[in-house]
A protein has these predicted regions:
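Phosphate-group recognition and catalysis centered on beta-loop-alpha active-site segments
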Residues: 1-242
Length: 242
């Protein structure tokens, strides 16, 4: 059985607050193959690492991420919701993440955007990847195909992954999609993965990276099918089982 790479979903979020520097450090300590994280743009145009469109759920603040500057987001308490020991952990910038991680693992950057035209994260993310020479290390994913299309046109060397959680989206089935923008990877929700999907993806030349798998039995099923990446909240558990 071919062993898939295991990515820490939002860092090691079971033992440290998700999408914070401590969670990413603990993921590195587990020797994961990769880390998955989410990015938004702050009020002052910086890429910041947080999952939701608001800060309400994972910090002591209230409001939309885009209404805070990066400095204001850094000053929030993004850790106490898990444990008081992480109270000093704020919302990091993507630059701070890469300062910590360096080239020690692969990175899946998911662009969060409610904008049907793709959002304002594309240009600064492309600039960061170019400046830090991250082409081989980073894959950019999104549920929004327009976001990925903007990425492709802005810099065709950047690796892309299309997220989806139901049956194959129409824009993947249509003939125009492949010549315009075929992603390097498909990121389907794990319950829909079967032999048919794997065969289709491999025939298209796409890797299959799946999320969010926390059950060992399910991880073994996916590994047997030949998925390339398994993203998990418990990467240490999944790695030990495989």
């Amino acid at each position: 059985m071919r062993h898939p790479q295991i990515f820490a979903h939002r860092g090691a979020r079971v033992v440290a607050p998700e999408n914070t520097l401590p969670a990413f450090q603990k993921a590195l300590d587990m020797n994961v193959a990769g880390i998955e994280l989410d990015v938004h743009c702050s009020k002052d145009g910086q890429l910041v690492v947080i999952h939701d469109f608001t800060v309400n759920k994972t910090t002591n603040g209230k409001g939309r991420v885009s209404d805070f500057t990066a400095a204001e987001l850094a000053s929030l308490d993004a850790g106490s919701h898990l444990s008081a020991e992480f109270a000093s952990s704020g919302v990091p910038t993507l630059h701070q993440f890469f300062d910590l991680v360096g080239n020690r693992c692969r990175v899946n950057v998911e662009i969060k955007s409610e904008d049907p035209e793709g959002g304002n994260q594309v240009e600064p993310l492309v600039a960061l990847i170019q400046k830090r020479a991250l082409y081989d290390q980073v894959i950019v994913s999104s549920f929004n195909p327009i976001t990925l299309l903007k990425m492709r046109y802005t810099d065709p060397k950047i690796q892309l992954g299309l997220l989806y959680e139901t049956a194959l989206p129409p824009h993947l089935r249509q003939a125009w999609f492949t010549p315009i923008m075929q992603p390097e990877a498909l990121h389907p929700y794990y319950p829909i993965i079967d032999e048919k999907l794997m065969t289709w993806a491999k025939n298209k030349g796409c890797a299959v990276n799946t999320w969010t798998v926390n059950d060992v039995t399910e991880a073994k099923r996916l590994a047997a099918l030949g998925v390339d990446v398994i993203m998990s909240d418990v990467p240490d558990l999944i790695m030990a089982a495989l």
